[in-house]
Amino acid sequence: MRSRKFLILLVLCLGILFSAQAEPVVSYLGPQGTYSQEACQVFFGQQGEFLPFESVSKAVQSLVEGKCDYAVIPQENTIGGAVLDYVDVLIAHKEVFVSGEVELLINQNLLAFPGAKLSDIKEVFSHKQGIIQGRKWLDKNIPDAKVTEVSSTAEGACLVSEKRDSSYAAISSAACAEVYGLEILAPGIQNNSSNKTRFYVLSLKEPADESAQRLAFIATGKADNLPALMAAMKKKKMTLITIHDRPQKTELGEYYYLIECTGSYKSYQKLAGKSNFDLRYLGSFDVR
């Protein structure tokens, strides 16, 4: 009887231990309330410990140092284009791979301290992307307001909350209004109602899922070789999704191209064998 009870207790303890180990630790661009945090929740559900960092580079550095299992960072926006920080960190950290992607519909709102009126606003805080996405609305409705760039849309909301002054506002999410005790002074101020942002889920494990629908890699080389690379991709039925470039900072016309396309790890291997570029595999993954 004792041995049976001991066995049951052992199984329960192992189950608890396994459950605790299975829960991922995930870094993201913070503070609390950012769209990056929302992307974490979409990808991992509520099963995870989410750690906010003040910049994309610090979120990724925590992954590199082994302080977390994954990092979730913004990649590209419909209106603002590439989030260049993400390109730079992937170029810099060769040990980092793309394990997944999340696509979110982004609704930007003008948040202010409770009781504030639009005529009160003298300064607006937001991330560079939030400012770009809401620029037309700002120019039309509060053209004289000072616009100040901060590290994230949530950081802007946090600053307004701390100042407790009706002359300040932030371009941020509806979730941040709740988190930081603010009111939505104007909803949906983005330039495009179909405004979306892609987020990458990064890890230190090299993914090579043959069933995945997307593929990402970095091509390093001269700009005049790019047409040949695109032609080779087309021949292998790899449809280009997005391409972002950064200079190598060696000679004019030499770039890093971060490319996302349809295809699998096998597609990448075939492409890498016949390319004039130095190719670096980032991952095969699906989009959520």
Language-model features: where?
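Bacterial N-terminal signal peptides that target proteins for export
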Residues: M1-I8
